[in-house]
Amino acid sequence: MSKEITGALFKQMILHGAAAITAQKQAINDLNVFPVPDGDTGTNMSMTIATAAEALRKAAPSSVGQASSVTASALLQGARGNSGVILSLLFRGLSKALKGMETADAAAFAAAMQEGVAAAYKAVMKPAEGTVLTVSRLAAKRAVDTAAEGADVETTLAAAIEEGYDALAQTTDMNPVLKKAGVVDAGGKTPNAPEAVLEAAIAEGQLALEPTTEMNPVLKKAGVVDAGGKGYLLILEGMLAELRGEPIPENEEEPETHKEKADFNAMAQEEITFTFDTVYVVRKAREDIDLMPLRAYLSSIGDSLVIGEDDETFKVHVHTNTPGAALTESQKYGTLELAKIENMR
């Protein structure tokens, strides 16, 4: 077992994580009913992490801090949809915690996972439990607890993933949309060595995943677990597979083998309050610019608001009926670089 995560190992872990969710993206799409029933969480998360994988293939990170920084920057720039932006935030917080480190042992990696969760909760304007936020939070806590007991990274991550799946199962009753659809959340599946941390995180994540159905009223209504939570756990499982020397998944499973699938026909379009899924990137006018006034404005004209940022740019995801107003207001904080607007009806 690996005692510590190096830059080269972290790179391979991300490549494995990207392959794992790509192989199951349609299964994740089939669970996606929250925050809106558009069936694209698997696609968005897989394409988001694919940008990090591409960036890492071109890099030769000399440390875990550098590898995680490349990953976080690429994820922010390539984030698609609500689930992609939240995924980028989980790794942004992790990257900040690993900054300057040559290698990371179980305790350091577990603590970094927890920092990622804190970053995600802080960036989401109205955090909803029974989602990837719940799954990642409980998984990270399990990772920290397991690492504190002296477990290696593999064992720690596996335990966290197990806990995450347990929480995911409860997302259906926690979220009414998932309960109605009958699925879980799509976005959220040697002492101090990395393997133990990942084992614990995966174990905890698995435990956390199941309850997401009960925790989120939307998921409960749909009868599914959280798609984002499931997707996150798949990425962690791929990372753990690299630590264990297991192969990267190559083929996506056939649709008929899916055990869970949301009934999208049962999810009426009137549940979509805001029509346009709006995602855009703004280059900051200055590094220390205060985005709180912008957060307040955007939350007043839409929902599902998430803002991720690094030193030079910020990325906004919001559902709104007035995307033009969102873009105009945001340009007070810098220069618009990229925008994508989709009609969700």
What positions do the PLM features span?
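N-terminal loops that bind phosphate or other acidic moieties
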Residues: M1-R345
